[in-house]
Amino acid sequence: MSMKQKLLLLMGGMMLTAFSLPLAAQSISWTDDSQKPDTLWYTEHKEGTEYTLTKPEELAGLSVLVNTYQYTFEGKTIKLGNDVSLAKTVGEETVLWTPVGLYIKGHKIDIPFKGTFDGQGHTVDGMQVSGTIEAVGLFGNLSGATVRNLVIGSNSSVTSTNSSAQIGSVAGLLTKSRILNCTNHMPVSSPGGTNVYVGGIIGRMNVSGYIGGCKNYGEVSNPGSVGGITASTNKADTVVNCVNYGKVTGKDADNSYTGGIVGYLYEDSR
Protein backbone atom coordinates (compact mmCIF):
# COMPACT_ATOMS: atom_id res chain seq x y z
CA MET A 1 0.00 0.00 0.00
CA SER A 2 1.38 3.42 -0.96
CA MET A 3 1.95 6.22 1.55
CA LYS A 4 -0.79 8.22 -0.17
CA GLN A 5 -3.26 5.35 0.23
CA LYS A 6 -2.34 4.96 3.89
CA LEU A 7 -2.84 8.69 4.45
CA LEU A 8 -6.25 8.62 2.78
CA LEU A 9 -7.33 5.69 4.94
CA LEU A 10 -6.12 7.48 8.06
CA MET A 11 -7.94 10.66 7.09
CA GLY A 12 -11.11 8.72 6.37
CA GLY A 13 -10.94 7.01 9.77
CA MET A 14 -10.38 10.34 11.51
CA MET A 15 -13.38 11.91 9.82
CA LEU A 16 -15.67 8.99 10.64
CA THR A 17 -14.59 9.32 14.25
CA ALA A 18 -15.03 13.08 14.18
CA PHE A 19 -18.56 12.95 12.86
CA SER A 20 -19.65 10.07 15.10
CA LEU A 21 -18.76 11.97 18.26
CA PRO A 22 -20.32 15.45 18.24
CA LEU A 23 -23.95 15.06 17.21
CA ALA A 24 -26.72 13.39 19.14
CA ALA A 25 -28.14 10.13 17.81
CA GLN A 26 -30.49 10.57 14.83
CA SER A 27 -29.92 14.34 14.67
CA ILE A 28 -30.12 15.98 11.26
CA SER A 29 -27.28 18.17 10.05
CA TRP A 30 -26.91 20.63 7.19
CA THR A 31 -23.93 18.54 6.05
CA ASP A 32 -25.99 15.35 5.68
CA ASP A 33 -26.44 14.13 2.10
CA SER A 34 -30.20 14.42 2.59
CA GLN A 35 -29.83 18.20 2.92
CA LYS A 36 -27.88 18.40 -0.35
CA PRO A 37 -24.90 20.52 0.71
CA ASP A 38 -23.48 22.21 -2.40
CA THR A 39 -19.74 21.85 -2.94
CA LEU A 40 -19.73 22.40 -6.71
CA TRP A 41 -19.08 26.13 -6.33
CA TYR A 42 -15.57 25.10 -5.30
CA THR A 43 -14.86 21.65 -6.72
CA GLU A 44 -15.63 22.81 -10.27
CA HIS A 45 -13.60 26.01 -9.87
CA LYS A 46 -10.61 25.09 -7.70
CA GLU A 47 -8.32 27.38 -9.65
CA GLY A 48 -10.23 30.44 -8.41
CA THR A 49 -9.22 32.64 -5.49
CA GLU A 50 -12.55 34.31 -4.71
CA TYR A 51 -16.01 32.78 -4.27
CA THR A 52 -19.41 34.29 -3.44
CA LEU A 53 -21.99 32.22 -1.56
CA THR A 54 -25.70 33.08 -1.57
CA LYS A 55 -27.47 29.90 -0.41
CA PRO A 56 -27.47 27.92 2.86
CA GLU A 57 -26.59 24.77 0.91
CA GLU A 58 -23.43 26.48 -0.33
CA LEU A 59 -22.49 27.49 3.20
CA ALA A 60 -23.07 23.89 4.29
CA GLY A 61 -20.85 22.84 1.41
CA LEU A 62 -18.05 24.92 2.91
CA SER A 63 -18.36 22.88 6.10
CA VAL A 64 -18.15 19.63 4.12
CA LEU A 65 -15.17 20.83 2.08
CA VAL A 66 -13.18 21.81 5.18
CA ASN A 67 -14.22 19.10 7.63
CA THR A 68 -14.41 16.09 5.34
CA TYR A 69 -12.05 16.84 2.46
CA GLN A 70 -9.72 19.10 4.45
CA TYR A 71 -9.55 21.96 1.98
CA THR A 72 -8.16 24.77 4.14
CA PHE A 73 -8.94 27.62 1.69
CA GLU A 74 -5.61 29.20 2.56
CA GLY A 75 -5.01 32.12 0.19
CA LYS A 76 -8.66 32.16 -0.93
CA THR A 77 -11.52 34.55 -0.10
CA ILE A 78 -15.14 33.55 0.42
CA LYS A 79 -17.82 36.25 0.42
CA LEU A 80 -21.48 36.28 1.38
CA GLY A 81 -23.56 37.74 -1.43
CA ASN A 82 -26.70 38.21 0.70
CA ASP A 83 -28.25 37.31 4.06
CA VAL A 84 -28.42 33.54 4.62
CA SER A 85 -30.92 31.69 6.82
CA LEU A 86 -29.98 28.32 8.29
CA ALA A 87 -33.41 27.90 9.93
CA LYS A 88 -34.86 24.60 8.76
CA THR A 89 -36.82 21.68 10.14
CA VAL A 90 -37.48 18.19 8.81
CA GLY A 91 -40.68 16.95 10.39
CA GLU A 92 -40.25 17.98 14.01
CA GLU A 93 -36.45 17.85 13.89
CA THR A 94 -34.34 21.01 13.71
CA VAL A 95 -31.57 20.81 11.13
CA LEU A 96 -28.37 21.49 13.05
CA TRP A 97 -25.38 23.43 11.82
CA THR A 98 -21.98 21.70 11.69
CA PRO A 99 -19.28 24.34 12.38
CA VAL A 100 -16.67 24.93 9.68
CA GLY A 101 -13.41 23.46 10.98
CA LEU A 102 -12.97 20.69 13.54
CA TYR A 103 -11.08 20.54 16.80
CA ILE A 104 -11.27 17.47 19.03
CA LYS A 105 -8.34 17.56 21.42
CA GLY A 106 -8.73 14.08 22.88
CA HIS A 107 -8.65 12.53 19.41
CA LYS A 108 -5.87 14.84 18.15
CA ILE A 109 -8.11 16.16 15.38
CA ASP A 110 -7.20 19.71 14.33
CA ILE A 111 -8.75 20.69 10.99
CA PRO A 112 -8.99 24.49 10.66
CA PHE A 113 -10.32 26.93 8.09
CA LYS A 114 -7.38 29.09 6.95
CA GLY A 115 -8.93 31.39 4.37
CA THR A 116 -10.68 34.76 4.42
CA PHE A 117 -14.44 34.92 4.98
CA ASP A 118 -16.03 38.30 4.23
CA GLY A 119 -19.66 38.66 5.26
CA GLN A 120 -19.87 42.02 3.45
CA GLY A 121 -22.23 43.22 6.19
CA HIS A 122 -24.69 40.38 5.60
CA THR A 123 -26.36 38.28 8.30
CA VAL A 124 -26.29 34.54 8.94
CA ASP A 125 -29.36 33.67 11.01
CA GLY A 126 -31.22 30.58 12.15
CA MET A 127 -28.01 28.72 12.99
CA GLN A 128 -28.56 26.01 15.61
CA VAL A 129 -25.71 24.05 17.19
CA SER A 130 -26.10 21.59 20.06
CA GLY A 131 -24.79 18.22 21.22
CA THR A 132 -21.22 17.53 22.30
CA ILE A 133 -19.24 19.41 19.66
CA GLU A 134 -15.98 20.75 21.13
CA ALA A 135 -15.35 23.83 18.96
CA VAL A 136 -18.65 25.63 18.36
CA GLY A 137 -19.75 28.59 16.23
CA LEU A 138 -20.38 29.32 12.58
CA PHE A 139 -16.72 28.30 12.42
CA GLY A 140 -15.38 25.71 14.81
CA ASN A 141 -11.65 26.08 14.27
CA LEU A 142 -9.80 29.03 12.67
CA SER A 143 -6.04 29.13 12.11
CA GLY A 144 -4.29 31.80 10.05
CA ALA A 145 -7.74 32.94 8.92
CA THR A 146 -9.63 36.23 8.66
CA VAL A 147 -13.37 36.64 9.27
CA ARG A 148 -14.75 40.13 8.72
CA ASN A 149 -17.93 42.17 8.27
CA LEU A 150 -20.20 39.35 9.44
CA VAL A 151 -23.43 39.57 11.46
CA ILE A 152 -24.92 36.63 13.39
CA GLY A 153 -28.69 37.01 13.81
CA SER A 154 -30.76 36.76 16.98
CA ASN A 155 -32.71 33.69 15.84
CA SER A 156 -29.58 31.57 16.14
CA SER A 157 -28.44 29.61 19.19
CA VAL A 158 -25.25 27.70 19.94
CA THR A 159 -24.36 25.54 22.90
CA SER A 160 -22.52 22.32 23.78
CA THR A 161 -22.47 19.84 26.63
CA ASN A 162 -18.83 18.94 25.92
CA SER A 163 -16.77 19.32 29.11
CA SER A 164 -13.94 20.99 27.14
CA ALA A 165 -16.02 23.10 24.76
CA GLN A 166 -15.02 26.44 23.22
CA ILE A 167 -18.15 28.26 22.12
CA GLY A 168 -18.65 31.55 20.27
CA SER A 169 -21.02 32.96 17.68
CA VAL A 170 -18.38 33.50 14.99
CA ALA A 171 -15.94 30.79 16.07
CA GLY A 172 -15.08 28.45 18.92
CA LEU A 173 -11.27 28.38 18.68
CA LEU A 174 -9.08 31.15 17.22
CA THR A 175 -5.37 30.67 16.47
CA LYS A 176 -3.24 33.29 14.70
CA SER A 177 -6.40 34.66 13.07
CA ARG A 178 -8.23 37.98 12.79
CA ILE A 179 -11.88 38.77 13.50
CA LEU A 180 -12.79 42.22 12.18
CA ASN A 181 -16.02 44.23 12.45
CA CYS A 182 -18.27 41.30 13.33
CA THR A 183 -21.52 41.57 15.32
CA ASN A 184 -23.46 38.99 17.29
CA HIS A 185 -27.13 39.16 18.36
CA MET A 186 -27.76 35.57 19.48
CA PRO A 187 -27.44 33.94 22.92
CA VAL A 188 -24.31 31.86 23.51
CA SER A 189 -24.29 29.43 26.43
CA SER A 190 -23.13 26.20 28.01
CA PRO A 191 -24.11 24.20 31.10
CA GLY A 192 -20.37 24.40 31.49
CA GLY A 193 -17.48 23.47 33.67
CA THR A 194 -14.10 24.98 34.48
CA ASN A 195 -12.68 23.79 31.15
CA VAL A 196 -15.45 25.35 29.05
CA TYR A 197 -14.98 28.75 27.35
CA VAL A 198 -17.93 30.82 26.14
CA GLY A 199 -17.66 34.19 24.37
CA GLY A 200 -20.09 36.41 22.48
CA ILE A 201 -17.82 36.48 19.42
CA ILE A 202 -15.05 33.91 20.04
CA GLY A 203 -14.95 31.10 22.58
CA ARG A 204 -11.20 30.94 23.19
CA MET A 205 -8.24 32.73 21.64
CA ASN A 206 -5.09 30.65 21.26
CA VAL A 207 -1.86 32.50 20.39
CA SER A 208 -1.46 35.68 18.31
CA GLY A 209 -5.14 36.23 17.59
CA TYR A 210 -6.73 39.62 16.91
CA ILE A 211 -10.32 40.75 17.47
CA GLY A 212 -11.07 44.31 16.40
CA GLY A 213 -14.18 46.46 16.02
CA CYS A 214 -16.61 43.74 17.11
CA LYS A 215 -19.92 44.09 18.98
CA ASN A 216 -21.94 41.64 21.02
CA TYR A 217 -25.62 42.12 21.87
CA GLY A 218 -26.42 38.52 22.80
CA GLU A 219 -26.67 37.09 26.30
CA VAL A 220 -23.59 35.05 27.19
CA SER A 221 -23.56 32.53 30.05
CA ASN A 222 -21.31 29.78 31.36
CA PRO A 223 -20.29 28.48 34.81
CA GLY A 224 -16.70 28.31 33.53
CA SER A 225 -14.86 31.16 31.80
CA VAL A 226 -17.11 33.64 29.99
CA GLY A 227 -16.74 37.02 28.28
CA GLY A 228 -18.85 39.38 26.20
CA ILE A 229 -16.35 39.18 23.34
CA THR A 230 -14.16 36.19 24.26
CA ALA A 231 -13.85 33.97 27.31
CA SER A 232 -10.07 33.75 27.29
CA THR A 233 -6.93 35.03 25.59
CA ASN A 234 -3.52 33.42 25.30
CA LYS A 235 -0.02 34.48 24.26
CA ALA A 236 0.13 37.72 22.23
CA ASP A 237 -3.63 37.91 21.67
CA THR A 238 -5.22 41.33 21.10
CA VAL A 239 -8.78 42.61 21.61
CA VAL A 240 -9.33 46.26 20.59
CA ASN A 241 -12.24 48.64 19.95
CA CYS A 242 -14.84 46.04 20.89
CA VAL A 243 -18.12 46.66 22.72
CA ASN A 244 -20.41 44.34 24.66
CA TYR A 245 -24.07 45.23 25.23
CA GLY A 246 -25.21 41.75 26.23
CA LYS A 247 -25.74 40.31 29.69
CA VAL A 248 -22.79 38.20 30.82
CA THR A 249 -23.42 35.55 33.49
CA GLY A 250 -20.66 33.51 35.09
CA LYS A 251 -20.01 31.74 38.37
CA ASP A 252 -17.98 32.77 41.39
CA ALA A 253 -15.72 29.73 41.65
CA ASP A 254 -12.08 28.70 41.42
CA ASN A 255 -10.76 28.63 37.84
CA SER A 256 -13.87 30.41 36.54
CA TYR A 257 -13.44 33.88 35.04
CA THR A 258 -16.08 36.41 33.99
CA GLY A 259 -15.64 39.69 32.10
CA GLY A 260 -17.72 42.16 30.12
CA ILE A 261 -15.23 42.00 27.26
CA VAL A 262 -12.71 39.25 28.15
CA GLY A 263 -13.19 36.62 30.85
CA TYR A 264 -9.53 35.72 31.37
CA LEU A 265 -6.77 38.03 30.09
CA TYR A 266 -3.43 36.28 29.66
CA GLU A 267 -0.43 38.27 30.90
CA ASP A 268 1.00 38.76 27.40
CA SER A 269 -2.34 39.84 25.87
CA ARG A 270 -3.90 43.25 25.56
Kindly give the residue locations of the regions a language model identified.
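Surface-exposed repetitive/solenoidal architectures
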Residues: 26-270
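Bacterial N-terminal signal peptides that target proteins for export
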Residues: 1-11
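Bacterial N-terminal signal peptides
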Residues: 11-22
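Nuclease and nuclease-like effector domains acting on nucleic acids or nucleotide cofactors
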Residues: 3, 19, 25
